[in-house]
Amino acid sequence: MKRIEPGPGQESVWDYPRPPRVELSSRRIRVFFADTLIAESTKAYRVLETSHPPTWYIPREDTKTEFLISGKGSSHCEWKGVATYWTVKVGDQVAENAGWSYEHPSTRFTAIARHLAFYPSRCECYVDEERVQPQPGDFYGGWITSDVVGPFKGSPGTWGW
């Protein structure tokens, strides 16, 4: 693994902390599914963790919850706690477990309680006007933009980092 050095206006995921940091942002965050706006906010939080592109958590009040139904299963993050999954449904189009939230996160992450994160591999996600690229693999939900460099955890062979 060779770290990519950030250029002007970029940040490296290898400079992000562990345990992760929560950071409020005023950038415009949008999520679409089936050509429908699901969420839009300028009050989202980024969670920054070593080796991962940022994961964005959108306030529930900035999300059109009428398009969300309870998803299947749950997972546990060593830092944030138990994640609840959400399925996005617009008309007859469905994205299973396309989003998640931490309804009752650990103390360090209370800022993101009841906020929603979405997988850019299952929804169209934007930071400002840039369409996000999904973090490799299908477990982590990081958002890759041109201002973040890796390499990123998630691809085959990176799980042991």
Q: What are these model-derived regions, one by one?
A:
Residues 1-161:
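Terminal leader/tail segments of proteins
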